[in-house]
Design a protein with these regions (language model features):
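Gly/Pro-rich active-site capping loops and adjacent beta-alpha segments
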Residues: 119-177
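Regulatory sensory and allosteric helical modules in signal-transduction proteins
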Residues: 52-59, 65, 71-96
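Short, basic/aromatic recognition patches
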Residues: 18-42, 78, 82, 94-100
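Accessory "access/gating" subregions that flank catalytic or transport cores
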Residues: 200-272
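Short hydrophobic alpha-helical segments used for membrane anchoring or interfacial signaling
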Residues: 47-51
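N-terminal leader/propeptide and maturation segments of large enzyme subunits in energy/redox metabolism
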Residues: 2-14, 154-229
Length: 272
């Protein structure tokens, strides 16, 4: 890490655990305010915190299925809305599978966090919506579907909330294309509310410890995580490892989909 500021181990541990607690509170808020059973009872959602460079620094202890895609979704959102165009209270919404969302029912919301005018990070959450339109209720029909346009409403990154105010025009477009608009609206607003809670907690952390200290902790967390992963990979004997498996077919008369991967380990913690 670039030694901008030294952090003692106790302070680092407190900051790190606070970030994890914020990510967990984000999810708890989402669960308690959601309208749909899938989110309230099925825990089909994920939460995370990101630094100002959109690198994940903390995860909530919820569904891991969305977390692998979340960094990609955040980066795509920022390609559409660069940091210098964002303002406090904004929220970016997307569900595009080509940008990382698993399928159209999975909506991601990303909120920038500012200390005065300085961007200090992002909070983000995903939630599986009960319906996003398409050929069948639930927006997961496979039989007879030949293209993504039949699957449901595809949302490229849009600013659902601008400066703390819901963009009702965008909300109406979404709700006009789903089968259960009350639950979808409720869950979208629950995601926004949960992000608001997490954003305030993150601002409190920065106020308590100072911007330089928390940003230095960000970097230490990332470096230590990388070091731990490289140490684990270095224990794998050098060589080429191959694996293949099959996904389910995608409808009547179709074959299972083969997935194959080759990974080369050099015995020093690097992979190809």
């Amino acid at each position: 890490m670039t030694e901008q500021k030294q952090i003692d181990p106790i302070t680092l541990t407190v900051i790190w655990n606070t970030m994890l607690s914020i990510a967990d509170e984000l999810g708890t808020t989402l669960r308690h305010t959601a309208f749909s059973e899938g989110v309230r009872e099925g825990d089909d959602f994920s939460t995370a915190l990101f630094n100002s460079d959109a690198l994940m620094v903390a995860q909530g202890n919820f569904s891991p299925g969305h977390l692998g895609a979340m960094p990609t979704c955040v980066k795509h959102a920022l390609n559409y809305f660069p940091a210098d165009l964002l303002q406090p209270g904004d929220s970016i919404l997307l569900n595009d599978s080509f940008m990382g969302s698993g399928h159209f029912p999975d909506t991601f919301q990303i909120m920038p966090v500012f200390i005065e005018t300085r961007l200090v990070g992002f909070v983000a959450c995903s939630a599986h919506q009960v319906d996003m339109g398409g050929a069948a209720p639930g927006s997961q029909k496979v039989h007879g579907v030949t293209e993504s346009f039949q699957e449901g409403l595809r949302l490229l990154p849009v600013r659902l909330v601008r400066g703390g105010n819901i963009e009702e025009d965008i909300m109406r477009i979404i709700l006009g294309n789903v089968r259960m608009p009350e639950k979808v609206r409720g869950d979208l607003l629950a995601q926004h509310t949960a992000n608001l809670t997490a954003a305030e907690r993150l601002r409190e952390l920065f106020r308590d410890y100072g911007t330089d200290t928390v940003e230095a902790a960000y970097e230490l967390i990332l470096n230590r995580s990388e070091q731990a992963m490289r140490e684990a990979l270095s224990k794998v004997p050098a060589g080429l490892y191959s694996f293949e498996d099959y996904l389910d077919d995608y409808g009547p008369g179709t074959e299972p989909i083969k997935m194959a991967v080759d990974i080369t380990f050099n015995g020093k913690g690097d992979v190809e």
